[in-house]
Amino acid sequence: MAVQQNKKSPSKRGMHRSHDFLTNPPLAVEPTSGEIHLRHHVSPNGYYRGRKVLPAKGE
């Protein structure tokens, strides 16, 4: 079993965890309808990059 040789200081522990945070996903605004959606995804009303590619829910 692996056992540490020396205790890691709070500074080193913080440096080790410095990349563990979460970031918000980048959002895009659809130019035709103004709706907000995830980048590279179809907006809820069925538009992608200004073109209608899917029928919207309820159409």
Curated annotation (Swiss-Prot):
Stretch list, region Disordered: 1-59
Cystine residue pairs: none
Pfam (any one): Ribosomal_L32p
Alphabetically ordered keywords of this record: Ribonucleoprotein, Ribosomal protein
GO BP annotations listed: translation
Compositional bias per record (Basic residues), positions renumbered to this chain: 49-59
This protein's GO CC annotations: large ribosomal subunit
Coiled-coil annotated spans: none
Any one Gene Ontology molecular-function term assigned to this protein's record: structural constituent of ribosome
Similarity comment: family membership: Belongs to the bacterial ribosomal protein bL32 family.
Entry protein name: Large ribosomal subunit protein bL32
Record organism: Methylobacillus flagellatus (strain ATCC 51484 / DSM 6875 / VKM B-1610 / KT)
Protein encoded by which gene: rpmF
